[in-house]
């Protein structure tokens, strides 16, 4: 995922979380908000409660690869914040991918 398509600052994260729409399932929480740009942006969060930095970065890379596989299907001019839940840790890559995109396409 290119840097252009990433939500990075705490201010942007908080703005999307506080004033955007929230969608949930047992594996993910997705906050989304329309942006004024011509492309979608994604932010990924994995809580410190779920494991050490190596573990959290592994799951962030996993989610990033899921997004890269389907990025061309999205062009909604929307910012997304994807938060992994503890229940998602025990699921396979395919199950997580299916659940994530069911939330994003609602």
Task: Pin down the residues of each PLM region.
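Positively charged, solvent-exposed patches that mediate nucleic-acid binding
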Residues: 1-106
